[in-house]
Curated annotation (Swiss-Prot):
Its main location: secreted. It holds the Pfam family GDPD. GO terms for biological process: glycerol metabolic process; lipid metabolic process. This is Glycerophosphodiester phosphodiesterase GDPD5. The keyword Transferase does not apply. Keywords: Cell wall, Glycerol metabolism, Glycoprotein, Hydrolase, Secreted, Signal, Vacuole. It comes from Arabidopsis thaliana (Mouse-ear cress). Glycans are attached at residues 120, 239, 260, 329.
């Protein structure tokens, strides 16, 4: 009996000795290919606004990888173009705010002034630089009160590089690209064959296998929403792809960049009835849903209710953890803000700079059903939740 009990320890000792003398390789295992964990569709979407840019400079590979690690459903990006027609991931049409372009003396003569949506904007515009030149620049954090240690570490990435990040993720991660400033891009960048900026965006998506109507089998394999503040661009690409589209909504007093209408006009019931032929949802600025006065949120408008009545999803922007952005009603607590918008306002997705906090809130308040088929999968899910804290 004693010898029997000791046998496992003896075998363990032998294995340890053997392992010290040579490299052990796992035996080959035959089995099906790994199936990625699918996108959840049972609770509001966690949309990583420019990646996890509350922690790492926006629109960088590191920011997107961090967002995936923290549990995002979608990684969001803004699409602009270089001078030579390469699609890049960058938010502003000028490079000044979030790159070190000013320190590159060789580019000092590139500063220009252009009309951008009725405003004269001066700076270093993306479309005045080739991709090779843009790759020499490095990204920096937009806000001074955020972590500055990553400034100067990461380059601008192309749209195709962004798509490979989603493709190579360990689970199904959706993408949420914005067709940014299409009027401006089409004015200053010319593509062969008379193609438009919008054509290039859709062509690139198709090249990487994106397509399919919302919640179709094809869509669920590679989830995608295409967003834009320009309604005519969304109508135009409806002839090119059946992928779901989202109309972004700015301050209601602002005019759209491609029509003579204000955003107040395009949030009317009559306009919703028209645009729902082309889009599956709207992406409003938060203050168009819930007005703010002296940093207090007021009574909500009926925008969400009316959008839902027209079978349109609502994905507001942008949710941020810092006190500079949190309204007093929420006592500097981002979880209170998430609770308000999800459970009282009833939104269908949230653009957030802090993917981790939104993911934690949803896991605590509306955990997904356990679809694990093995203890290994369950341990992997637990590890993904614990990892951010282990690194802290």
């Amino acid at each position: 009996m004693i010898l029997t009990r000791c046998l496992p320890l003896i075998w363990l000792s032998l294995l340890t000795v053997c392992a010290a003398g040579r490299t052990l390789h796992p035996l080959p295992v035959k089995g099906p290919k790994t199936v990625k964990l699918q996108l959840q569709t049972s609770r509001p979407y966690n949309i990583a606004h420019r990646g996890s840019n509350g922690e790492i400079p926006e629109e960088t590979t590191a920011a997107y990888l961090k967002a995936i690690e923290e549990g995002t459903d979608f990684i969001e990006t803004d699409i602009l173009s270089s001078k030579d027609g390469v699609l890049i991931c960058f938010h502003d049409c000028i490079l000044d705010e979030t790159t070190n372009v000013a320190s590159h003396k060789e580019f000092a003569d590139r500063k220009r002034t252009y009309d951008v949506q009725g405003f004269n904007i001066t700076g270093f515009f993306t479309f005045d630089f080739t991709l090779k030149e843009l790759k020499q620049l490095r990204i920096k954090q937009r806000y001074a009160f955020r972590d500055q240690q990553y400034n100067g570490m990461y380059p601008i990435i192309t749209f195709e590089e962004f798509l490979t990040i989603a493709r190579d993720a360990p689970r199904v991660v959706g993408i949420y690209p914005e067709i940014k400033n299409p009027v401006l891009m089409n004015q200053h960048v010319k593509w062969p064959g008379g193609k438009k900026f919008e054509d290039k965006v859709v062509e690139t998506l198709k090249k990487y296998g994106y397509g399919g109507s919302y919640l179709s089998k094809k869509w669920l394999k590679k989830p995608l929403f295409i967003q834009s503040f320009a309604p005519t661009s969304l109508v135009y690409i409806s002839n090119l792809t059946d992928s779901p589209k989202v109309l972004l909504i700015d301050d209601v007093t602002m005019p759209t960049q491609d029509t003579n209408q204000t955003y107040a006009e395009i949030t009317s019931d009559a306009y919703f009835e028209y645009i729902k032929q082309y889009v599956v949802g709207i992406g409003p600025w938060k203050d168009t849903i819930v007005p703010v006065n002296n940093n207090y949120v007021l009574a909500p408008t009926d925008l969400v209710k009316r959008a839902h009545a027209h079978n349109l999803q609502v994905h507001p922007y942008t949710y941020r953890n810092e006190h500079e952005f949190l309204h007093y009603n929420f006592s500097q607590d981002p979880y209170k803000e998430y609770d308000y918008w999800i459970n009282e306002i009833g939104v269908d997705g949230l653009f957030t700079d802090f993917t981790g906090s939104l993911h934690n809130f949803q896991e605590w308040t509306s955990p997904l059903p356990d679809t694990s088929k093995s203890p290994r999968q369950l341990l992997s899910q637990i590890a993904s939740l614990v990892l951010p804290y282990a690194k802290a």
